[in-house]
Amino acid sequence: MEVRADAWAVDAACSGNPGPMEYQAIDLQTGARVFHFGPMRGTNNIGEFLAIVHALALCWQQGLHNKTIYSDSYNAILWVRKRQCKTKLERTPQTEKLYEIIERAERWLQTHDYRNPILKWETGKWGEVPADFGRK
């Protein structure tokens, strides 16, 4: 399978686990950043999950129902398909705001029947996902 051009790639970065987490999306046709969020205390998997949901919600809002979303996170793709963030991050005063965002994302998934394909970015074949923060 080849990379679809009419697509966005999402990725998250987190310094520590948990730690300052951020995520973004890049348009594969133009290379432009579609959105960026963070940093906020969290985990990489949460960032990957929120990045996909953010991309889906933006596509929905803009009527882009066929745009493909690529993520290199198998866990996040699975969580989105199950419409639930399965994080083990402890809910504390420091993570409360993040948990509110997670709950909003889960609610969005449960109330919207999105059609966008969500595909695994094949890093081994295609190199780093274009939305990568380049901090490894």
For the regions a protein language model found, what residue spans apply to each?
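Acidic helix/loop or adjacent segment enriched in Glu/Asp that either coordinates divalent metal
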Residues: 8, 33-71
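RNase H catalytic domain
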Residues: 15-17, 57-135
